[in-house]
Amino acid sequence: MARSGGNDGHEEELDPELFEEPSNLEGYEDGEFEEDEEEFEEEEEELEEEEDEEEEEEENVTTDEQSGSPKSSQPVKLQSSDVLDCPTCCEPLKRPIYQCSNGHLACSSCCQKLNKKCSFCRCNIGDIRCRAMEKVIEASIVPCPNAKHGCKETTTYCNQSSHEKVCKFVRCSCPVSNCNYVSSYSNLKSHACSTAHVWGEDDIHFQLVIDRPRIFNMNLGRKKTVVFKEEKEGDLIVVQAFKGLEGVYVTVNRIAHMAPGIRDLSCSLAKLNEYSTLRSGSLVKKIQKVREKMHLEDDLMWIPPKMLSGDHWKMQICIAYGYKFIHI
């Protein structure tokens, strides 16, 4: 046993365990205890999710406790909804929301794009959650923008765009060039079938029967849009042609809302030439108004220059319900 000399000249016995190396440090030099950066980030995300769940449970408990108290919550009206938007990208804030040491806010997406640097003061941001603002966002309930047209749905402020995409009361515009009629999908169909609807001289339009092919002409020199009205239901199908550097692109869309409940339409399209035919099949996409420019996400039929003879050519179309493509 080790001994140590004291001030009085006597030796004291020391516990040998004090001089033993800790067993839990074995392998430290070999790097066995080094944490992988990706694993650390995953653990951090899991901790954040657990914190969110615990926070929601605490909020529910608090709400239950407060429900029995005489003081009840009251709705609050904001003068401007801008305070609920990310000050950097101006999009609605949603959890997780972060703040820098100076109190500036940013959404999770902006934190990543700016490499965790505050866009206002350049301080670090992306580690400190702003729980208070997250509670405000979750409690912010707004009516649908189409409430005045009959929609009774309400959503949180950060999720209103998701509802707008599938709202059946969304405004649909008549595709006829000289008509300014805007209303719901059902009203638009009634409008197209009524005698009050007037087709202009420059508007190219045809009646259309489901499952029955129809030949029509397109003339890029005069009009790049052809409108078909389905004979029974009154659905409006819009065929548009867009000139490109490498030929012409043709799209087929339907004026309708995106809400579930209406049957999908499929389209079989053919470009007719004297010695050859170009065919294409796709689902008919729903839009709310005629587009002035081509969208790359649309299903397109590409017609190469060698199949074009001037601005006037002949095409054939067949519309069917569901995923049904008819060879034409």
Curated annotation (Swiss-Prot):
Keywords: Metal-binding, Transferase, Ubl conjugation pathway, Zinc, Zinc-finger. Pathway: Protein modification; protein ubiquitination. Coiled coil: none annotated. GO terms for biological process: protein ubiquitination. PROSITE patterns: ZF_SIAH (PS51081). InterPro entries: Sina-like_RING (IPR049548), SINL_plant (IPR044286), Znf_RING/FYVE/PHD (IPR013083), Znf_SIAH (IPR013010). A zinc finger (RING-type) spans 86-122. Zn(2+) 2 binds at residues 174, 179, 191, 197. Residues 136-324 are annotated as: SBD. It holds the Pfam family Sina_RING. Its EC number is 2.3.2.27. A zinc finger (SIAH-type) spans 139-197. The keyword Zinc applies. The keyword Transmembrane does not apply. GO terms for molecular function: transferase activity; zinc ion binding. Zn(2+) 1 binds at residues 144, 151, 163, 167. It comes from the Eukaryota. It is an enzyme of class 2 (transferase). E3 ubiquitin-protein ligase that mediates ubiquitination and subsequent proteasomal degradation of target proteins. E3 ubiquitin ligases accept ubiquitin from an E2 ubiquitin-conjugating enzyme in the form of a thioester and then directly transfers the ubiquitin to targeted substrates. It probably triggers the ubiquitin-mediated degradation of different substrates. This is E3 ubiquitin-protein ligase SINA-like 5.
